[in-house]
Amino acid sequence: MSRFFRRRKFCRFTAERVTEIDYKDTVTLKNYITESGKIVPSRITGTRAKYQRQLARAIKRARYLALLPYTDLHNK
């Protein structure tokens, strides 16, 4: 029986030695929100708790400043 290979989760911010997550970096922030606009939990992304808190704060600031949408699922 062949089992599928699960990739090991790791914190990108720790690996890149990021000191603080910037709310203006929307390209990075978009990787941590779902299509519906929800923040992806750390148990799925592998982000450490310290950076998950910074990430949530940065996403919320970016939403408030209209850099990121609150939701993308608007019916047309």
From Swiss-Prot:
PANTHER family: 30S RIBOSOMAL PROTEIN S18, SMALL RIBOSOMAL SUBUNIT PROTEIN BS18M. Pfam families: Ribosomal_S18. Binds as a heterodimer with protein bS6 to the central domain of the 16S rRNA, where it helps stabilize the platform of the 30S subunit. Part of the 30S ribosomal subunit. Forms a tight heterodimer with protein bS6. One of its GO terms (molecular function) is structural constituent of ribosome. This is Small ribosomal subunit protein bS18. It comes from Tolumonas auensis (strain DSM 9187 / NBRC 110442 / TA 4). Keywords: Ribonucleoprotein, Ribosomal protein, RNA-binding, rRNA-binding. The keyword Ribosomal protein applies. GO terms for cellular component: cytosolic small ribosomal subunit. InterPro entries: Ribosomal_bS18 (IPR001648), Ribosomal_bS18_CS (IPR018275), Ribosomal_bS18_sf (IPR036870). Belongs to the bacterial ribosomal protein bS18 family. GO terms for biological process: translation. The keyword rRNA-binding applies.
